[in-house]
């Protein structure tokens, strides 16, 4: 199954600051996601409803906005991606 992948600005900003090879890997990962492949996993607890795509040491957080559309929301290094995303997510909910 093929999906439309909508890449949000925080993902573009993150990818732009990477070196060329990781940048290419992220683009390949997003293409794999578009065709329903890749190392994907649903997130749990306060991040339920979101998913992660693993690309090397990087993670892309995404969600389904329709049965055929995915929104790539956030990307960061594995060591901090979830806490930074959750912090942003909770902050936006409170405002």
Model-predicted regions and their roles:
Residues 59-60:
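Histidine-centered metal-chelating micro-motifs
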Residues 28-54:
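A short, surface-exposed loop/turn module that caps and links secondary-structure elements
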Residues 17, 32-33, 64, 75:
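Conserved catalytic core of Hanks-type protein kinase domains
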Residues 43, 56, 74-77:
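A secondary-structure boundary/capping signal
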Residues 20, 31-35, 90:
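Short, intrinsically disordered, mixed-charge
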């Amino acid at each position: 199954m093929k999906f439309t992948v909508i890449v949000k600005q925080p993902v573009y900003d993150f990818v732009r600051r990477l070196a060329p090879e990781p940048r290419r890997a992220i683009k390949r990962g997003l293409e794999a996601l578009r065709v329903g492949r890749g190392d994907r996993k649903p997130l749990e607890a306060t991040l339920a409803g979101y998913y992660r795509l693993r690309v090397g040491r990087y993670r892309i957080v995404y969600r389904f906005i329709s049965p055929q559309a995915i929104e790539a929301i956030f990307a960061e290094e594995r060591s901090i991606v979830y806490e930074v995303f959750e912090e942003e997510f909770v902050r936006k909910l409170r405002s």
